[in-house]
Amino acid sequence: MAPKRHLGLGKAAKSKKQKKDDSSEVENPVQQSNELTVELNEEVDANDEVSQLRALWKTHAKSDKDNELVVNGIIHECDRLLRNSNLAENEDGEDKNKASTNEDGPKELPADFHSIYALALADLALFHSTDVNKVKEFFDAALERVDLGLQSHTGSIELLFTKSRILINQIPLQYISQLTVESKVQDGVPKIDEKLDAALKIYEEAENQAKALKQYELFNEDNLEILQAFDDLLEIVDNFGKDNSEGDESDKEDDGDYEEEIQLSKKHPLYGIRNTDKYNEWWRDHTIQFLQNVDQQLEKLGISYKQENETENALLPLRREICKRIGQSYLQEAEIPSTVFTTLKYDEGFADVDQLEGLTRDESQKISQYLFKTALDYLKMAEDKEEPESWVNIAESMISLGNLYELDSEEQENYYTEAEKILTKANNATNGKYEDILENLQT
């Protein structure tokens, strides 16, 4: 059987954005169809059109991204700025003085302009996901825009990050969406792992250049979304075929070939991703590297993540989120060895079995203990003093770790006792939300 993915988080770790009230979006359909207004903060120059574009893009990026009108508005604004820039360049050859006083738009557009333009074009594909031709058209245009930007800004790290993001997002929307379990690599159907390798290579190029030039500020919330998109992609690959098999549970039970139906042949376009752990390992290695680069920013600012500040730097919640994702990835990796240990140790039906999943009882115990301890280290760094759920994540990991020791041993009791203290605190802070977990621990 194909190995299961243990490291990635996918949508389970992705923070869910709350939907806004739809009523506010339809109050004035005339204005909505013809205007886009963005509230600029005090730092944005109202006379700087590129700054206004950045503000519009930032508003979109932090939203649910479900408004095609906004995306089209961004693209139209990019078109206008590009036309003005090209006009200024043409005028420069005829009248340099005239070009220098042209106020319609900047003469040379910055790298992030091309990044915004390309990402907006790629986002349009989300609104036309059922039309493969349009999806291809939007991604082709997005990648062309990035490449044009790289011609103007050779080696731009920001544009390299953008290109890797677009290439990763392209894979599920343009390629995986057209596949079935029976699909094979042939004319017009590429190996998806080769597409993914190309995207990850570009990400690594951007990552290495940013580190070499000490541009650690590029390791921010926006670029963390690249790793999240990659993680979501791995989850899609893991679950590929299951959606088509969903239905009457009785049918599944009667169908002895059910598991075989969702296995992929070696000729399947997704086989090269599903049947290896290298992509899961890549995700975690580069997420840890991302964390280290965030720490470089904090060190430069003289800020310790352990320090409690009245006004918290924006990098600190970002750091906690990264630590949470890494910690949860170790928890997921621990699932199989910990299950092997408890089965071999406590299940009488396996009394004569020496190994499961290639692991003995002692091996599975040691591996599980290491993984849970590592997860616990990261989850402690992810703790938010204002968020009880983060405390509970720590407590539950302590309970799982305690379960891997001998019954009533000192190690087990220590983990259980500490977990109970944390759960009691969280339960009191949430008016009894964690009462069931606490009671199970105490019985």
Curated annotation (Swiss-Prot):
* Residue ranges, compositional bias (Basic residues): 1-18
Would you tell me the Gene Ontology cellular component terms? nucleus
Membrane-crossing residue ranges in chain numbering: none
Task: Point to the regions of Acidic residues compositional bias.
Answer: 246-261
Which keywords does the record carry? Answer: Nucleus, Transcription, Transcription regulation, Translation regulation
* Xref: Pfam families: Nro1
State the superkingdom: Eukaryota
Q: Where in the cell is it found?
A: Nucleus
Q: GO terms for biological process?
A: positive regulation of SREBP signaling pathway; regulation of translation
Respond yes or no to whether keyword Oxidoreductase is given for this record. Answer: no
User: What InterPro entries does its record include?
Assistant: Nro1/ETT1
Q: Where is this region: Disordered?
A: 1-44, 86-107, 241-261
* Major subcellular location class: nucleus
Q: What family does the database annotate?
A: Belongs to the ETT1 family.
Function as written in the Swiss-Prot or TrEMBL entry: Required for correct translation termination and probably involved in regulation of hypoxic gene expression.
The protein's name in its UniProt record: Enhancer of translation termination 1
User: Gene for this protein?
Assistant: ETT1
